[in-house]
């Protein structure tokens, strides 16, 4: 009886950890998409070409 309870507890614990890890990864993917949003807040006079260059540079760096 106690061993069944321990196995059930362990199973629930592992499943909850896996779910938390998946949620964390999804949040990080969303954050990665917004990495260059701070450039808009800096009020820099970047041309669209310069902004595109920076975005491409970040994409190449991530690969």
Swiss-Prot record:
Keywords: Secreted, Signal. Residues 1-20 form the signal peptide. It is found in: Secreted. Transmembrane segments: none annotated. The keyword S-adenosyl-L-methionine does not apply. Expressed by the venom gland. It comes from the Eukaryota. Its main location: secreted. GO terms for cellular component: extracellular region. Belongs to the non-disulfide-bridged peptide (NDBP) superfamily. Long chain multifunctional peptide (group 2) family. This is Anionic peptide NDBP7. It comes from Lychas mucronatus (Chinese swimming scorpion).
């Amino acid at each position: 009886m106690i061993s069944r309870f321990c196995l059930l507890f362990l199973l629930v614990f592992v499943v909850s950890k896996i779910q938390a890890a998946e949620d964390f990864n999804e949040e990080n993917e969303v954050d990665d998409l917004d990495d260059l949003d701070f450039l808009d807040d800096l009020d820099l006079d970047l041309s669209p070409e310069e902004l595109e260059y920076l975005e491409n540079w970040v994409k190449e760096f991530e690969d």
